[in-house]
């Protein structure tokens, strides 16, 4: 009998780890270095695994909404995906405003929410809400993990979806029993999602058509939105502007698409845009719009917008094209790829007096508060322009946001963080903290109003805890200023529910400021000092430098600089609701 040869094969199985440990491994595989987290029972197993490692630093803000805004600020300032985690129920619902804010402004976030056991879902369990049902319409994608085997695929897809195409937030809801379940530790290396294929090419034929139209234009204009900076196309955009000599206007989110000091840059357009930019938008014969959505803040009355021009619209999101404004040449593409092709095919031509006419108009009708006496937001913001090179500035929402976008000089991407789409009060301060964490060597400012800053003022504790040297600037006029401005101009000064002063019949005047008769709750200086921060109240122009010097020298935490300004100082120009851009108010109604 022949000798039998027996062969044995040893199959090495992948190590088995818990779902909680797998989540941490996924974060590490995706090169996540910062996780913004607020703990709870539904995520305690993941937190325990985070405790055992040192690759992912965990930041503990003091409220889930602020946590989302901090992750948002981190993402906008670094260009990376921001990652946050909260518990189930109220943890998830507190996150909702931050998710919607990021979705409106195309900010890539991965939001992990804890959830009750699968077997308890639908039974009104403690801290149970239908998280996916709540957020489905305010994020790119939301899913509850129902099988431990699917956890890797879902997390891999979450990061891919968040950062590709039009970026945005993705919500992954992980039940507690999935976190405890054992499974393979293998993490996927590829993504293949049926039905989700972001466009990565440019239709050259459409680009050539666009170039043909531009070559015949006598009054062409670039309208740049947030998509230019999101795609990292700022340097290429500058080359395109200089090659063509075409003037540039921007949306609020688009500011920084090119250097705002460039001679061809006219300023912001829209309902609080400058006179020259809005006139240019009305008078141009060809508009090249890149990375914009044409929302109502840009267009004013839709039926009167850009009636006499051809519109070329470039956007990565096909759903944004011809959604509000019918366009002549649609190009669905990433802004950077499209600009590269425009540079390849476009040929400059003589634009006559058009650029010079617009520059003269800008000089004749500047956006300025130069006629105001005493301390103004413009003077404060000009100090930043003149003393800091490429700082990061986060704004809140309201007059503070609009003044900042009017007067702040930007030199490129990742410099100004603001809630442009949703208009979320309480965004500015936590977003600045997230930016400081992401860019520790950068000078970071938050410019807020006295109303919005109180929505997340508790984040002073976070700033002190992590020694974040953010400078919080509060423009304090004693009111919810943006609404009050509308009440002044269109509601006969009936200041209903906007007065934040102790005396509800008072307004802040220059006389009150000069004579120190300003009564306000809280005392922001004492509040900041209670957290261990430095603070100073400033009422005179000559004290501005002293305030910023205080902020520059304190490195162990935040500094609060409170600037007292008159209540009835308004943001102008302004387009009234329902009016066209040509109906701008250039000065206050008497």
Where are these predicted regions, by residue range?
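N-terminal alpha/beta PP-like core and its mobile active-site loop of ThDP/TPP-dependent enzymes
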Residues: 10-349, 383, 470-472, 490-497, ...
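Active-site diphosphate/adenylate-binding microenvironment
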Residues: 20-23, 28-33, 46-50, 359-436
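Short acidic loop-to-helix transition motifs that present clustered carboxylates
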Residues: 43, 64-69, 400-402, 540-544
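Thiamine diphosphate
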Residues: 112, 121, 126-127, 271, ...
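Short glycine/proline- and acidic residue-enriched helix-loop micro-motifs
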Residues: 139-141, 192-194, 359-373, 508-510
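Flexible, glycine/charged-enriched surface loops at secondary-structure junctions
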Residues: 167-170, 348-361, 368
